[in-house]
């Protein structure tokens, strides 16, 4: 097995028992692929598929004028290069976008001869700006990173369901069907409690379904023929003969004696007809049964009956037979009649009853009825009626089932899936009603709407396409109106197309849609999880209030597609989910998961992706099935899922068709990072998965000693760790950049063979956490494509590292860890283990006001010298300044309005020309409760305003950095070129050259070294071909120089042009403060198993419980937090972490003793290769083994994959290996080595029983006490109630609520209560009076009338009740 550059630095020992045949796919693929398909930017126009932008253009164009003489056709579109890159957009507050231009053709026909083309105009038209996706799957909108969350919505198609007996008091099941298109009107069919079938369009008034059937051209006879089978009767003078159909009589009670053709009675009256009776009648060759007259009465006619002589209609289809009607039929000589066959069991008379309720006569009347329902009050003209009916379901402009919808309709109605129009067809409506009637008759099953075969994912590309199409259709309307003038006014395409509607639709979607969210950027995991989220909320989705339990619940089809664990707690539970690790979307937007094919009980290497619908056809075994070395299933019975319900049952191996690809395939990325997940209760696992997303990146990231093996995948896929784009040799490294000279075989001809990686340094994330990248390569290192070359936030050697490994003891400690509180050693704080850096952005703008422009300046009166010392001559603080609350960061003065001056002031002004009072100080100051170091300043100046020195120096620094990059590229390009030249020139004969090189002389290496490299081009080789090569190299270098000069000039132009600022803003300054947050009491911490708590006390290191060898614990947790929470995973993690720490110490001791590489190999082999997944240590050189050992000193990292992790005996084995008996005795370990005798740090006495001690990976969460702590004496008040505002952001007070009032009442603290409800709250006069009294030194309260009482009086008056206050 080949290890990558970073993997071999620290190999994670894996306990996985099963080899993976299928690698975890790229975690951001769903988002990136969806948007790539939407744009198709890199695909030539001729080869673009009909999807995304192309589909939207194709759907709207061509646009024809109302008179048909002019039309506009779409040719192609292209996206220009973005004007600014991602970083520049973030700094300037711009959107990272590309301009969309479409080539359109305007065709104008001749007025006299409409068939003849008069003129054709083709032009490229600007169609607005389309935001581009960054390489990590996010969007930069107005300078902030946002994510478009995928939406899980009900798929278009036809669905059948019932109300579960909730509608009617009897509990009767009322069946309904719904045809949902992608775009257009919904069509519902529903039974009412009287079993009459109705339909409704777009949830409007319901109407009998036969109206709809008549409107599509069916007569009552045809309707009955579609839904019923007929009984054939031959009328006789008395009674009739019924055509014998055996299955129709079975189960009925005979209403008369039934005889065979010989007259023998087979079934007596009032007896139930059973199978034997049917057989007897059948064997006797019975074809007809004589029935009495009353058997005919009440039966329903299937067809119109017409008098053969007169042609008059005697009876209509759906009429009931009565004695009078039978008499008329006999008189008219009618012999044969057909009636509807119905029964109470499986052939109800529903359509017949519905026809009776329906009062419309024919197709026209039916369509008019539909028109009146859709457009009440409008007169139904023939054209209007026809147009509306066509537009409802048959017009491609207003109705679209989409490919998915057509596929779902066809598969549900039992047709070949891919065929059919995208609009509704008559057969679709008829078949749907038939299936619904069959359901009511007890045949077939209703659909499960929570099945993932009936819910699909709308990804970024599709959501953006819908918005673009909406904008384009607004453009279409405007173009249609103006096309008529195109000929007369000689207009060009750009005169007709206004791109504003498109831009505004796109801007609205990306800026303010419910699915466009501010990216959660706390750490790499939260970033990746946000992009893999699927939400059932949003436009066209569910709402929190209406979503019931079933929608939120875990469904069997979620297996391998949606994570059953990771979902928010609270009102959104179950509505917002995360994609499972291996899930992907198919072409229809349904979620698929991979399964490994099994043939004849043997696993193959073939992997198939199955959607929820396809999976229902197969028997799928679980990944933990026992498999031998050859891949055969060995158990007699295997646990597998089968049937549409996906119930788990035991099956024989020969029935298994597929098996899971990995045990972790059912969970999401966040849940798969929890080791021993299988031992945690589901609720706590949910909290653990969610809290990892809130972990704040620490100053020094520390990889988890106990991981799951997925850490590297998450770190790399999130984009926070830098990967090498191409293999090569590291040429230059510093903290800011890495330069790699690309391998010859990977370099593309004509391109620069240099990759430069500018690292992100101390940059603010959306959540104000710090993003910082650190190089992990040295000059001369060989790296391959995809190797991690720099660590980012929360990554350690290319692995995700959200927290720190802490030595944890489970024991109570003086009540300080009561109720999940956490006790922490002072050492943890002193070593900065949980110190994090947070970056705050503070900005100030100078505007043009009515009284004159605001000015950013150092010249501010009444400002202390100490404050001014921090500002440069432009009035802006310098980088590196340490500032505290209230310090000035940017000096700014605002013109003040002219005020009435006193005579004295006028005199002073006349004498001294005192002007200082004309301006007021509006400088940017550090907010209260904040202190830090200024790490960056950015100045933006409007076009036309001269830059100050500070702004100019920032631009100069940026250009210097860019020039450095270009110089490095040029240096390497030239270096490669001159090396190649040297190989070409050495030992070649010349005609002459610099330094008097004689004709016929041979070139030597020494000669070339002696002259300047640029003089090599002056050498005149004798070989003409060589001379041509020499010239070609010279031209190539000059070409590159020219390109770099152009690039530099472009960059300079970009930086020196004025910035786009909001209207009225002259200058904007942004100051970035780095705030260091140490761990302190009140901060929230958590493990990965949902074990969360608040730091209660930081204890001096000498008072912490310690081991026999003097090692103190870092954290003391309460053991009572484990049993009731049922998250035993944390105990197993602690034991395995303890083993990892011990093994690291053993390796460290060996390195101290300068052990040979072979000894190290022996120990490493015992650790890595005696259980779990073996590692190829022999492929490492001795130097690499030594580097590996050095990186393992702090602990050997373990991987225990979810559902395939370490077993108890493996943990014991590792503990025995880590702590041989002599070491165990020295440390005071018990025989199991899982517990240890601890001593009280304060008394030195041993605790009375052994304590579980080990290493746990603990996280500091983004709920820091510094952000929550807040105090107020006086501050802002609410305008109406005059009560203090609430919350830290408003500088509010503490609410004294109803229950608190009760408490003071209970204690009888009347004066405290009066003070609380009046002068401390909303008694305006009382508040000022108290202040006056305090100033005077009088400590008394004069409580007045609370403002809230006045508000109450006003509210009562608003009801028209005159209420007044009698003051005595």
From Swiss-Prot:
InterPro entries the record matches: DNA-dir_RNA_pol_bsu_ext_1_sf, DNA-dir_RNA_pol_bsu_external_1, DNA-dir_RNA_pol_su2, DNA-dir_RNAP_su2_dom, DNA-dir_RNAP_su2_hyb_sf, RNA_pol_bsu_bac, RNA_pol_bsu_CS, RNA_pol_bsu_protrusion
Keyword terms: DNA-directed RNA polymerase, Nucleotidyltransferase, Transcription, Transferase
Catalysed reactions listed for this entry: RNA(n) + a ribonucleoside 5'-triphosphate = RNA(n+1) + diphosphate
First-tier enzyme category under EC: transferase
GO CC terms: DNA-directed RNA polymerase complex
Domain of life: Bacteria
EC number: 2.7.7.6
Function in brief: DNA-dependent RNA polymerase catalyzes the transcription of DNA into RNA using the four ribonucleoside triphosphates as substrates.
PANTHER family with a match to the protein in the record: DNA-DIRECTED RNA POLYMERASE I SUBUNIT 2
Name of the protein in its database record: DNA-directed RNA polymerase subunit beta
Gene source species: Cupriavidus taiwanensis (strain DSM 17343 / BCRC 17206 / CCUG 44338 / CIP 107171 / LMG 19424 / R1) (Ralstonia taiwanensis (strain LMG 19424))
Lineage: Bacteria, Pseudomonadati, Pseudomonadota, Betaproteobacteria, Burkholderiales
